[in-house]
Amino acid sequence: MSSGECSNVQLDDHRKNNLEIDEGREFESKEEAFEFYKEYANSVGFTTIIKASRRSRMTGKFIDAKFVCTRYGSKKEDIDTGLGTDGFNIPQARKRGRINRSSSKTDCKAFLHVKRRQDGRWVVRSLVKEHNHEIFTGQADSLRELSGRRKLEKLNGAIVKEVKSRKLEDGDVERLLNFFTDMQVENPFFFYSIDLSEEQSLRNIFWVDAKAMHGCRPRVILTKHDQMLKEAVLEVFPSSRHCFYMWDTLGQMPEKLGHVIRLEKKLVDEINDAIYGSCQSEDFEKNWWEVVDRFHMRDNVWLQSLYEDREYWVPVYMKDVSLAGMCTAQRSDSVNSGLDKYIQRKTTFKAFLEQYKKMIQERYEEEEKSEIETLYKQPGLKSPSPFGKQMAEVYTREMFKKFQVEVLGGVACHPKKESEEDGVNKRTFRVQDYEQNRSFVVVWNSESSEVVCSCRLFELKGFLCRHAMIVLQMSGELSIPSQYVLKRWTKDAKSREVMESDQTDVESTKAQRYKDLCLRSLKLSEEASLSEESYNAVVNVLNEALRKWENKSNLIQNLEESESVTAQDLPIHEEQNNTYDMNKDDNVADTGQEYSLQEVWKVTALQEQRNRYSILDDYLSAQHMSHEMGQINSMASNRNGYCSVHQNIHSLQGQSITHPRLYETEQSSFRPEAMYERLQDMVKDLN
């Protein structure tokens, strides 16, 4: 036997020794446990399947799983019943008239049972290693090769099936576009984008509701750990904070470091300690490289990429990031679980669109119901804590339920002061959490009322943790500092939705004005739709405002048309030697000019009288009107000065119609019918 063969045999023996399973062994997830059991089965010489799994009725998450030898059970049991002796729901072997003959059942009892703990980790509860049939110890490699080939064939088939299932049917594109068009009619800022292949297969659909961000860029963006996404976010949202999902980043460990994890059981725990146990960036860097060097992985390319992108996912680098409920450590299934209620795997595209709208509508109704409960129902206090009493009056019912869990959890925490900086009112505590079986570091600055905990619950969820509250209580504080009460979780959260345009000047562009009005309309629609009375009141106000604006628009249009008429059709009267020839012909001409001037004012006056209310605000005081008319009367006081009066009338005509101040808000008190009456009186006096 060559040295290479000897080393391979020794490596296989070493791997088998490290693949031994005992009760109490822990895993990060159900998938990791199953992958480990498959490796164990391959090393021993048998194959395994997932026989059963169970979800929690409360949360819908997996809490139990059972992996068995493929010869587990008997043919009769599999065909006749779907319930195992241990209470799990076991899939029946008979499907669509066929019997599963993939392997011979020998009623083998070998299995592995894992269960999910409260902290999310999975632990081995029970197992049976003995088989009642022959195992193929010498054919483990062949089994692995065969298993890999079957997986590849199964994967290829699934891909083909998925591609076929995504091909659009006749009318689907039209339905989709109609759906998006209707959404845009309801909400002008609704955005969508469709990506189709050359074969008319659907590749991607993207749409977003305008109410999600009110037209503002996102402050924080969470994505998977991907370099292309990293570059894309930097290009599109350069000022947003980009973070990676921790569940995705660390979830790649079994794949990237599986060969090391199987040999070194403490690797995962030590990496987690370096990530979560570091209070400063310097501490993390030191602890990280100690772990990497201890397990001789400094040359690992994947770990190098994680370290280079540490500011995107390591908690200690995200102290300034407020995720406000978005979780990076665990995958959020809220959207998927919500859709599962309305759609199934075989749901048609048309049915999906209908069910999606139904889901959104029910979500809105649930939010309205929750708002009503918050306003009219007081949450029950389960603790005499002053923090609980304080926030019961401030938080919404749903948020207070979450907050009260932390209040009650404070009884399991024991704080101990570690240090205090001289000259600065800053103290550091180490809080032992006996419920989570971990210790956390809390820093309290009494001068600035700033409290920071290494668990980072406030940054992740938006409310203070039990560790921070126990330190506040120990320091004599009886209320939570205001900076740790986010308004988005309070009863008056709606009042925060003040448009930015209320505080800053709207840019004088049509697009900006249109955007501002749409945002205001959205807010008004949300409030007015709460009751029929508010709806009717708002509709009446909107109709009245629309009529007023139409009348104002018509008036301005008439003034502009009058300006055009006087500028083009009325000749300019030229005077010579400051004398006025009062012969008949000139009188006729003057009458024509006088009539044109009257017509201009009459059209405007009749328009305003027909509208029955003043379009231009009546801000002009009596003194201002008297002063202005006094000037006109003074011009007419001397009958021999009729010529100059007539000139001033023409001057007034041109000035009144063409002067830009007519269209300014500050001159909106100008009343054409009043001026027309004054001009008539003045002409009578002259005659």
UniProtKB/Swiss-Prot annotation:
A zinc finger (SWIM-type) spans 440-476. InterPro entries: FAR1_DNA_bnd_dom, FHY3/FAR1, Znf_PMZ, Znf_SWIM. It comes from the Eukaryota. Residues 35-137 form the FAR1 domain. GO terms for biological process: regulation of DNA-templated transcription. Pfam families: FAR1, SWIM. One of its GO terms (cellular component) is nucleus. The keyword Transmembrane does not apply. Its main location: nucleus. The keyword Nucleus applies. GO terms for molecular function: zinc ion binding. Belongs to the FHY3/FAR1 family. Putative transcription activator involved in regulating light control of development. This is Protein FAR1-RELATED SEQUENCE 1. It comes from Arabidopsis thaliana (Mouse-ear cress). The lineage of its organism: Eukaryota, Viridiplantae, Streptophyta, Embryophyta, Tracheophyta.
